[in-house]
Amino acid sequence: MASGTMRDPKNSRAENTRPRSTEIFERGKKTLVGGVNSPVRAFRAVGGTPLVIDYAKGARLFDVDGREYIDFVCSWGALILGHAHPDIVAAISDQAARGTSFGMTSPLEVELGEKITKAIPSVEMVRFVNSGTEAAMSAVRLARGFTRRDLIVKFEGCYHGHSDSFLSEAGSGLATLGISASPGVPDAFASLTLNTPYNDLNGVENIFKQYPGKIAAVIVEPVAANMGVVPPAFGFLEGLRAITKKEKSLLIFDEVITGFRLAYGGAQSVFKIDPDLTVMGKIIGGGLPVAAYGGKREIMEHIAPMGPIYQAGTLSGNPLAMRAGLATLPKLEVPGFYEDVNRKSQRLAEGLRSALKDAKLHGEVNVSGSLLTMFFTDVPVRNYAGAKKSNAARFGAFFQNMLSRGIFIAPSQYEALFISAAHTDADIDRAIAATHESLASMQEH
């Protein structure tokens, strides 16, 4: 279906039948677990045939059935400039001809490291890795080694990758599939991670009272984006900084999503909080697999080869990802860049609220910068417990209705919508119109 055609299907799941996608997905299930390489892509939470993408350009996805979609997932937030930006494509192509992996240091790693440390004052040194999971896992190992303590505090519904430390009461795919904890994580290991509600300083204080002198770090998404978007309550981040300083524990900001998205200096520059360690990913690689963790020099120098805390990787700092990152970050420094994407995000949020009101449906729209979520619930969403009160069946129907109208949003109530520089005001208008039509259609059926 061309994205310019708005439809009002009686049966949106039938409308979203895609024979070529179905054929490839079924074929893939014979060799790929569940037919996918990341669970949320299987559409288990929303039903129907998963998208199988042929190519993408700007703010558009094109599936193997020839259908076109305005993309509000943006590779889960990584593509703030949109798909296949010509300058990034040119940089990657040029680098591919010069070598894709050296297994040794290149000047590109130094240059991107300098860009990041200049952008984020709390990050004095950085170590590149290949995924957000690896970065968060390594940051926690560093925190434990530096403080000589074992316990980590995390927040219910926050997602820090799929390492064993973080797979209890996590957001993202675990929330989507209703998994509270993953088998395969030994109880003894899971007991080293202490969960408490997001936006609840009393819960944090009580944990520190219960385990005095034993907590290595508190890790937090400064804006939660894996239980849907949930901004921090007034004083929450400031309180975490004060508590961790008092208790001589480290504060780790997981800015895999918010880094270089809320602002060039990340969420920490918006909220004016300096963490001890920062986890980054997505945007810094321009759509290629890359992540990083960084922080104060006195902490980072404990990592090998300067210190005894080991971490390594064959493809860490690979030149393709470094070139893509170096092609991306300067464009984010252009005056007005963030004001523009944030303005479009606010317009979309206002449009979603208007559509809910017109349809006489309960809903909450949370927005922070260029990421937002519409929750089908009648209570404010301030933490994971609030997010879980959302009507999952209604979200599934909404997702299918939007997809049938050429609008692709995340196939989970617990994920964010993302705005990129490639989205136009016309794209926002189309998404708002599709929302009005979808909610009206849901009321009729």
What is the meaning of each model-derived region?
Residues 4-445:
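Conserved N-terminal phosphate-binding loop of PLP-dependent enzymes in the Aspartate aminotransferase
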